Amino acid sequence: MSAALPAEPFRVSGGVNKVRFRSDTGFTVMSATLRNEQGEDPDATVIGVMPPLDVGDTFSAEVLMEEHREYGYQYRVVNMVLEAMPADLSEEGVAAYFEARVGGVGKVLAGRIAKTFGAAAFDLLEDDPQKFLQVPGITESTLHKMVSSWSQQGLERRLLAGLQGLGLTINQAQRAVKHFGADALDRLEKDLFTLTEVEGIGFLTADKLWQARGGALDDPRRLTAAAVYALQLAGTQAGHSFLPRSRAEKGVVHYTRVTPGQARLAVETAVELGRLSEDDSPLFAAEAAATGEGRIYLPHVLRAEKKLASLIRTLLATPPADGAGNDDWAVPKKARKGLSEEQASVLDQLAGHRLVVLTGGPGTGKSTTTKAVADLAESLGLEVGLCAPTGKAARRLGEVTGRTASTVHRLLGYGPQGFRHNHLEPAPYDLLIVDEVSMMGDALMLSLLAAVPPGARVLLVGDTDQLPPVDAGLPLLALAQAAPTIKLTQVYRQAAKNPIIQAAHGLLHGEAPAWGDKRLNLTEIEPDGGARRVALMVRELGGPGAVQVLTPMRKGPLGMDHLNYHLQALFNPGEGGVRIAEGEARPGDTVVQTKNDYNNEIFNGTLGMVLKAEGARLTVDFDGNVVELTGAELFNLQLGYALTVHRAQGSEWGTVLGVLHEAHMPMLSRNLVYTALTRARDRFFSAGSASAWQIAAARQREARNTALLERIRAH
């Protein structure tokens, strides 16, 4: 092979020498012999997502050449197709291949097969398997295992090769096989856009493959998929549960560049096929008649919204009681001790209601009230469950109440098959206290309330002025208007002296912070060179362990990725490292988990410190939970010196450095800066521009399209 490092992927063929590591997701590290017209590398390190491989397997692949600081040159697989024959067709090679890859064949039998048939054994197994009965030791039962094993491998090879022939990468092809099974190729040949049903593959990817194959731009399959994509994106990017029909049609036009008439037909077709749903509820008939358009949902979102409204109505309409129909909730005088009148009213509301909402801004005593509720419930002999959407928020809830709290997912017993606790097997609590409810979308709220036992109570705690949830829906806002709700308004003396809390309450009235306090200040920076300036400010404030950087966006000169690059360069410089989702991680780096990992008990948003980096493995300390991560697990990590404000929701730090500039204009809103500011306990410093804060303070968020409140009130 050439000693130079080509910038673009190139083609090679090769054979497997040794598989060193393989994860459940297909991420593999192996030693292989690679060759192309430029030469041969007899002991190449090859990494990436690959089909199941064993010693002796042959393949063709598209690879990128990289240089690792510790391990030297390695080849990263972009795409790979497994061949049907081993590289070594000698007697020893055939024997090794049969032993490793063909079911029912051990070392002795493999040697006999190789000696009897040599390289012809593969064709015979495919075309005339009965001849194997000539080999001593092969019975009808053994032959059946051999043929079944070979057929299964052949099917998988043909599937993967066929899918890659459609233009899919090996990673996409394996995902498709996992999702559709043996029907994967047939399904995608009939409609390539069914690829969008596969987790992690969206319309834009499928459309790129479609256009590369010369597919018609006005094909109904393409337009229907675009209509579904418009609704999916409305949920994931804007949190909408539905779109007015005209907005859905505009989405189709935007993503496909077809005419409005074709887009209208696409939405109609998607509804007829059941891939979208139009809400035909009498509740919205007058609106539809007046506007001439209905509300378009993804079917599962519409079902969830209706079911959630039904559950909430049941909780509001039924009295609290134990399994025998009794209720002994009483509020003695001592339970009110130290509480204001509005705080104590929460205890009284829980006497007669199963579902109560507690809201309020910083410094108003939500934590004190929550602890008082838990104390009273336990004094009455009730089982109390405490949870929050994220691990950090759960830890904070546990600290303020003096009890064990968990994530919502853990409390509900989340596993591969979903939640263990549901309406059939409710969670074993008489009272559920849920904090940071502003982070919960409709889907998670539905799972939570479905697991509430008959007669049990729920206290939902949150701040309606914070950022809305990442997921679709806005359940806290609806519940705060439909359920018994106590909004704490009194800011307590000690909190009132905190300039951060003063500024937070000012933001709610559209006022930008009054900078200039030693605990609340702003440094003007520009996007050009701004990330470097932020890194220097972090150093002045004591380094990454003493301050958390927050920013509205991931991308851009003042986005999370660029800030992390400069922060890592200043505080943990070096070359190489282990590849993660963005960049590389080295010992000493701060990282953040971006997905729940129940096997390792690491939850979305948890910060960790890299202790060790070896090969393609990282050892990370997540608040005392030391885990070794490898393969696809590494791509659930990002550098965590800087976080987005959304990622920081539910967390709190002593000192926060918030980056805010007009460069973040699409994201600037009152809820965003209020959430960023209230992540700081003691000191908040901003890098950016005062005018950006003024713009954000004056700008309310776009209303979300959700009908939850209307459905709750409809009965």
Swiss-Prot record:
Residues 391, 407-414, 470, 554-555, 596-604, 644-647 bind DNA. It catalyses: Couples ATP hydrolysis with the unwinding of duplex DNA at the replication fork by translocating in the 5'-3' direction. This creates two antiparallel DNA single strands (ssDNA). The leading ssDNA polymer is the template for DNA polymerase III holoenzyme which synthesizes a continuous strand; ATP + H2O = ADP + phosphate + H(+). ATP binds at Q343, G363, T364, G365, K366, S367, Q466, R493, R679. InterPro entries: AAA+_ATPase, Coronavir_polyprotein_1ab, P-loop_NTPase, RecD2, RecD2-like_HHH, RecD2_N_OB, RecD2_SH13, UvrD-like_helicase_C. Gene3D superfamilies: 1.10.10.2220, 2.30.30.940, P-loop containing nucleotide triphosphate hydrolases. The keyword ATP-binding applies. Keywords: ATP-binding, DNA-binding, Helicase, Hydrolase, Isomerase, Nucleotide-binding. One of its GO terms (cellular component) is exodeoxyribonuclease V complex. GO terms for molecular function: 5'-3' DNA helicase activity; ATP binding; ATP hydrolysis activity; ATP-dependent activity, acting on DNA; DNA binding; single-stranded DNA helicase activity. One of its GO terms (biological process) is DNA recombination. It is an enzyme of class 5 (isomerase). Residues 1-150 are annotated as: Not required for helicase activity. It comes from the Bacteria. The keyword Transmembrane does not apply. Disruption phenotype: No significant change in resistance to gamma radiation, slightly increased sensitivity to UV radiation but remarkably decreased resistance to H(2)O(2), 50% reduced catalase B activity. Normal growth in the absence of DNA damage, increased sensitivity to gamma irradiation, UV light and H(2)O(2), greater efficiency of transformation by exogenous homologous DNA. No change in sensitivity to mitomycin C (MMC) or methyl methanesulfonate (MMS). Monomer; homodimers seem to be inactive. PANTHER family: DNA HELICASE B, DNA2/NAM7 HELICASE FAMILY MEMBER. Belongs to the RecD family. RecD2 subfamily. DNA-dependent ATPase (ssDNA stimulates the ATPase better than dsDNA) and ATP-dependent 5'-3' DNA helicase. Plays a role in an antioxidant pathway. Involved in DNA damage repair and/or recombination. Appears to move along DNA in single base steps, powered by hydrolysis of 1 molecule of ATP. Has low processivity, unwinds about 15-20 base pairs/second. Short (20 bp) substrates with 5'-overhangs or forked ends are the best substrates, is much less efficient on 52 or 76 bp substrates with 5'-overhangs. The presence of single-stranded DNA-binding protein (SSB) increases unwinding 4-5 fold. There are no RecB or RecC proteins in this organism. In B.anthracis it is involved in mismatch repair, in B.subtilis it is involved in replication fork progression. This is ATP-dependent RecD2 DNA helicase.
